Structure formats: C-alpha cells, structure tokens
Swiss-Prot record:
It holds the Pfam family Ribosomal_L27A. Residues 26-38 have a biased composition (Gly residues). This is Large ribosomal subunit protein uL15. Residues 1-58 are annotated as: Disordered. The keyword Ribonucleoprotein applies. Belongs to the universal ribosomal protein uL15 family. The lineage of its organism: Bacteria, Bacillati, Cyanobacteriota, Cyanophyceae, Synechococcales. It comes from the Bacteria. GO terms for biological process: translation. PROSITE patterns: RIBOSOMAL_L15. Keywords: Ribonucleoprotein, Ribosomal protein, RNA-binding, rRNA-binding.
Length: 151
C-alpha cells in the first residue's frame, strides 16, 4: 500500500470532464453548427435571449396589471363589536366573549373579541377583550367602566 501525500493525490476517473470546444472543425464533434441546430434565433450569435422574452410579443409580466393592496400574510382576525351594542347589558357586569354569546349579541365566536368605538355607551361595564380601539377605550372609561386586555 502506498502512502498518501499531497503530490500523489489525483481526482477520480471521470470526475473532471474536459470542456467541449465548439466550432473548431467537424472532427472535434461540435463543429459547423456547434449543436445549435440549423437556423433560427437560438443558433445566432448573441444568444440566448433574456428570461421572459417572447420573441417581441408583449411579455406576460407586462400584460398582467400591477396589483396593489395584497392581503397581509399573517393578518389577525377578530370578532368585532361596537360600543353601542353594549348598552343593553346590566350595569356593573363583566363583559367578555362568553357573556356576549350567552346574551345573544355575538352569534359566531370564532376569533378573539375586539371592541370598536361606534356609538355611545351609557352603562358602567368591565369589558374584557383581546383589543380595543382608542375611541372605544375612552368611551368605556368615560362611562365609568374599565378595559381589560387579554388574549
């Protein structure tokens, strides 16, 4: 067995393939048309065409309109309720998603509760929700109630 040294290292058989020299005569194997076929744009000099080029036809990426306002990827969804719909509840009661379902104000409690500030509140309530708008928070606290944020 021979010892391995840096000067004795060789690549495996067939690992280093020789580059084909195109257009160097028929005997070289890639002479004449160099493997590009007979005629056409792909056989001419200056090839290949750029990606997306459709031969002068208006390309797809220019035919399609530039659409704006794509939906957010990780958008949060909420069960929305306005402050005005809380007026029918008892004074001093605690309001959360479960209590709103029991009273029938919310019919499909699929997502966490978010309170919006449309309308006026005349009842003092303790509201527990995942999120509040700024106007909803001021109206609830203005009526003497409190806002508790939780997930």
């Amino acid at each position: 067995m021979t010892s391995i040294s840096l000067d004795s290292l060789k690549p495996n058989k067939g690992a280093r393939k020789r580059k084909t020299r195109k257009g160097r005569g028929i005997a070289a194997g890639q002479g004449a048309s160099c493997g590009f076929g007979m005629r056409g744009q792909k056989s001419r000099s200056g090839r290949p065409t750029r990606p997306g080029f459709e031969g002068g036809q208006m390309p797809l990426y220019r035919r399609v309109p530039k659409l704006k306002h794509f939906p957010l990827v990780n958008s949060k969804s909420f069960t929305l309720i306005n402050v005005a719909s809380l007026n029918s509840l008892k004074e001093g009661s605690t309001v959360n998603l479960d209590s709103l379902v029991k009273t029938g104000i919310v019919t499909s409690p699929k997502y966490p509760l978010k309170v919006l500030g449309n309308g006026n509140l005349k009842v003092k309530l303790v509201v527990q929700a995942a999120a509040f708008t700024a106007s909803a928070k001021t109206k609830i606290e203005g009526a003497g109630g409190s806002c508790e944020v939780f997930e």
